[in-house]
Amino acid sequence: SMFVFNYDGTFKYKYKALGTMEQIDFSGNIAACAVGRNVRTHNYAAHGAVVIDLNDGAELNFFHTDGPLQAVAISTNGRNVAGIEAPAVTPDGKIIGAYKLHIWHR
């Protein structure tokens, strides 16, 4: 989850991702978040990069990856997002994902 506050410290909203947020990068009023493992529900559809409008928490984009996304970066103009995926082993021994560099255009 990501908790967002105003500059005066008052709580604004909470954004709840479907998996663990591994890293967050910012460009203006948007945030790109790397979403990785979900050890509670094993929801592998949660893996990927999510782009959020920081003004209201609206999800602008979601870019799915097969494996957990470990790192993310967003360009200064907010138009491009890069992410690093890594493989993971599921509880039943299946390997999902691979070591990959992803570049997405918004």
Regions found by a protein language model. Give the residues of each.
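Short loop/turn segments that connect beta-strands within beta-propeller blades
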Residues: N6-T10, D53-G57, R106
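Residue-level signature of beta-propeller blades and closely related beta-rich strand-turn architectures
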Residues: R37-V39, E85-P87
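Short, solvent-exposed loop/turn segments at conserved positions within beta-propeller repeat blades
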Residues: R40-H47, P91-A98
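Repeated scaffold domains used in trafficking and secretory/extracellular systems
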Residues: G19-F26, G67-I74
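A short beta-strand motif characteristic of beta-propeller blades
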Residues: T10-Y15, A58-F63
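Hydrophobic beta-strand positions that form the internal "hydrophobic ladder"
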Residues: A31-C33, V81
